[in-house]
């Protein structure tokens, strides 16, 4: 499908990347994200190998902010986005940094205004494959991400959605959006403009097997990836 929005928007983002203002990684385009954490500054030597350090009264992130658990170096926001009490859409741009032609995506939920952890998986992890190992445009969207199992919320409750993208070398990028649960009628409408899947990005399943020589995947393995297939089918149906 044709990528929505203008090419000029992507060009502007690439310009920021090249200017050194952003050594970018992952962006949650719907329902939004905590804030601009696409920053890389300072050197590894200045931080003594740490992901964050204070130098001359300023905080540096030599590897980039998004490598920092749990939300890419961004604090909790008071400007929360409304999200449906029964679950809703999540759209991501995964190709903002080199090394992400293949990646695993995790989507978790943390409950409360300032969640003590992000230990509630919303969907099984899934793989994406992009067109190149260099930065690339494109969006993926899951139109109906459910609440974690055995989770009950009501309108007005606070939570944080965490998106993790693990690169092929195992390093993880973190991004979050702080939400307030609301009735669907109070939530920004999901459309083909804010929730779509770019044709240059494909999905892959993640499953376990007891034998690499088996001619067919075990039934339990197939059942374990069924939720991902269902979400992917819903996604492509919206294209």
From Swiss-Prot:
**Residues given in the record as Cu(2+) binding sites:** 25
Q: How does it sit in the membrane?
A: Lipid-anchor; GPI-anchor
Organism domain of life: Eukaryota
Q: Where is the lipid attached (GPI-anchor amidated serine)?
A: 214
- List the signal peptide residues: 1-24
Q: Which residues are glycosylated?
A: 41, 56, 79, 117, 150, 197
Q: Which UniProt keywords apply?
A: Cell membrane, Copper, Disulfide bond, Glycoprotein, GPI-anchor, Lipoprotein, Membrane, Metal-binding, Signal
Cofactor(s) needed by this chain:
Cu(2+)
Major location, coarse class?
Answer: membrane
Q: Give the matching InterPro entries.
A: BIM1-like (IPR046936), BIM1-like_dom (IPR046530)
Subcellular location as annotated: Cell membrane
Q: Key word Secreted present in the record?
A: no
Cofactor: how bound:
Binds 1 copper ion per subunit.
What cellular component terms from Gene Ontology apply here?
plasma membrane; side of membrane
User: Which Pfam family, giving just one, matches this sequence?
Assistant: BIM1-like_dom
**Function text:** Lytic polysaccharide monooxygenase-like protein that has diverged to biological functions other than polysaccharide degradation since it does not perform oxidative cleavage of polysaccharides. Acts as a cell surface-bound protein that functions in the copper-accumulation pathway. May also act as the major cell wall sensor that regulates MAP kinase-dependent hyphal anastomosis, the fusion of hyphal cells.
The entry assigns this protein to a family as follows:
Belongs to the X325 family.
Protein name according to UniProt: Lytic polysaccharide monooxygenase-like protein X325
What organism is this sequence from?
Aspergillus fumigatus (strain ATCC MYA-4609 / CBS 101355 / FGSC A1100 / Af293) (Neosartorya fumigata)
């Amino acid at each position: 499908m044709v990528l929505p929005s203008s090419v000029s928007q992507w060009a502007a983002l690439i310009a920021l990347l090249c200017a050194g203002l952003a050594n970018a990684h992952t962006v949650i385009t719907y329902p939004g994200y905590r804030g601009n954490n696409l920053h890389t500054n300072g050197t590894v030597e200045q931080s003594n190998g740490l992901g964050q350090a204070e130098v001359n009264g300023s905080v540096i992130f030599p590897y980039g902010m998004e490598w920092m658990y749990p939300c890419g170096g961004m604090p909790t926001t008071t400007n929360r986005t409304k999200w449906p009490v029964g679950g809703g859409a999540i759209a991501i741009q995964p190709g903002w940094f080199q090394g992400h032609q293949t990646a695993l995506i995790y989507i978790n939920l943390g409950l409360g205004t300032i969640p003590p952890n992000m230990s509630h998986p919303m969907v099984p992890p899934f793989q994406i494959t992009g067109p190149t190992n260099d930065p690339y445009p494109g969006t993926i969207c899951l139109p109906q991400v459910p609440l974690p199992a055995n989770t009950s919320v009501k309108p007005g409750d606070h939570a944080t959605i965490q998106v993790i993208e693990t690169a092929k070398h195992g390093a993880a990028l973190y991004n979050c959006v702080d939400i307030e649960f609301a009735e669907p009628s109070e939530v920004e409408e999901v459309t083909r403009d804010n929730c779509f899947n770019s044709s240059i990005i494909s999905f892959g399943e993640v499953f376990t097997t007891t034998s690499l020589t088996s001619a067919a995947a075990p039934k339990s393995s197939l059942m374990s990836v069924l939720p991902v297939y269902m979400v992917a089918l819903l996604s492509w149906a919206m294209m």
